[in-house]
């Protein structure tokens, strides 16, 4: 959730949701970053931010003040974002608020209270209830399970887009954040699914033998 490339992908994600509203079901999941994918220093983090910012032609540079290289993973913001789902907030508002707090404002998102306050304000819910839920074993279990799903895809780059259709087609993008290839793939897969539906309307299910 706090990956810089996930942050840069948000406009694409928002446009895909707008463009395919009513045609595609969208869902986000957490894939925790471990030491193998985390910078070893704040200076290294700044270097990565400069590179991604230049690639995105960004008018601003991401903030590294939040980053603590001694931490092996970032449970607090991810658990709070996941916990907000249990209060009915399955959209992007809490996740985006936490990402902005870290990557734009440099807030200490390793602090459970800071991230809970940020998430609660974004969702308009009680901060103590959100914090209690975020710290519950069930939430950590859920994000570790979704992280295991990510690893099972045998990809390494975030964000990852996994597109499935009812006819069994699947497309996986790892580290791709531009709209055009994702939209082209969705158009192709939706067209194939529509063709299957049209064929079934004319001929029914396949013969059993």
Regions flagged by a language model, labelled:
Residues 2, 10-18, 100-209:
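C-terminal cap of thioredoxin/glutaredoxin-like
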Residues 7-104, 197-205:
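Structural alpha/beta surface segment adjacent to cysteine/selenocysteine redox centers
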